[in-house]
Amino acid sequence: MAEYLASIFGTEKDKVNCSFYFKIGACRHGEQCSRLHNKPTFSQTILLQNLYIAPHNNANQNVANMTEVQAQEIFDEFFEEVFVECESKYGEIEEMNVCDNLGDHLVGNVYIKFRREEDAEKAVKMLNQRWFGGRPVHAELSPVTDFREACCRQYELGECTRGGFCNFMHLKPISRELCRKLYNRSKRRYGGSSRRRRSRSRSGGHRRSRSPKGRGSRR
């Protein structure tokens, strides 16, 4: 029995633990979820909840005449600021991703995966004492370590029918130029780490040629 329970942990067959929280670190039911949200006591990944506010969601931003290029520049500036500050203060970042979803539990979520668990723990402690954009930062350790399982494969293929309210991650891409700049900077600072993986939010290629696989129930 113990072996069976271990094999289904965090899957749709698990009626005790929430598979969405296990895979994505967020669940649309929040504290009202009928299944357990097992918050990790250690992890390489941290979640900064709802940190990014897109221009069209920002009451202080004039978006009437904003072009896609201008919107991308705003996002790139945000991404670079967070990435550079977190890596310089807390430690080497393996990847950083920002959700482009619209659901309250995912909108603007920033996931940062550090190389070391100790750095992630330090980041959570320090960031929870910080403010960003006039709002307090809410940071926590996240169970997400494999973003391939957390991301919507249909979205990556341009086939997601749920739009921004999909319960799997729709990642917002950064520009190719920024991607090269950030990860080359890190490579020079920390050396060529075999464990380093670039952000799945890199530009242009976020819709990959992969066959969609079943995800189970999307509550």
Model-derived features with residue positions:
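Cys/His Zn-binding finger modules involved in RNA regulation
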Residues: 1-219
